[in-house]
Design a protein with these regions (language model features):
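Extended, low-hydrophobicity, polar/charged segments
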Residues: 1-152
């Protein structure tokens, strides 16, 4: 059983398909999540927090098969001089979530959206509750986030 997430109302009101899927163990990588749910690695949606300047953060919504984010390319797309991944403890201090458990919704940062997520009817990522994965229509990510740039 889970509590009602605030973002669930927005998904329902806008008609986006989603499911909350319980897990029996933590999932620590895109490959681990794909194997657990029997999906393609590209169907997983890891969330990365990056910093462009002091206290200027971007949420990166990525396809799991992208590999490492090209920070130089991402910075150019966001018109930022440079991007650095936010360190583990600082991610928790800023968001209240540990890296690897950051939710696809509920964090109010401008986003870099990976268009590769649109290959699938549902993508799988964090719900914000440990051992509960969100499978959601990737178009909801585009519609319900402040998209600063799109990664092709």
């Amino acid at each position: 059983m889970h509590y009602q997430f605030l973002w669930e109302n927005a998904l329902q009101e806008n008609g986006y398909a989603y499911q909350l899927l319980p897990q029996t163990r933590p999932l620590r990588s895109a490959e681990d999540g794909a194997a657990y749910f029997g999906i393609a690695v590209g169907q997983t949606a890891p969330v990365l927090l990056v910093e462009a300047a002091p206290s200027q953060y971007y949420l990166c919504l990525l396809a799991g098969d992208r590999g490492r984010l090209d920070l130089v390319k991402a910075a150019a797309l966001l018109n930022a001089p440079k991007l650095t991944p936010v360190k583990y403890k600082k991610v928790y201090d800023i968001t209240g979530f540990e890296p690897g458990n950051m939710p696809l919704f509920g964090l109010n940062f401008p986003c870099l959206f990976d268009e590769a997520l649109l290959r699938y009817p549902l993508v799988y990522g964090g719900s914000g509750q440990e051992n509960l994965t969100l499978a959601v229509d990737p178009r909801a990510l585009l519609a319900l986030h402040q998209i600063a740039a799109r990664l092709k």
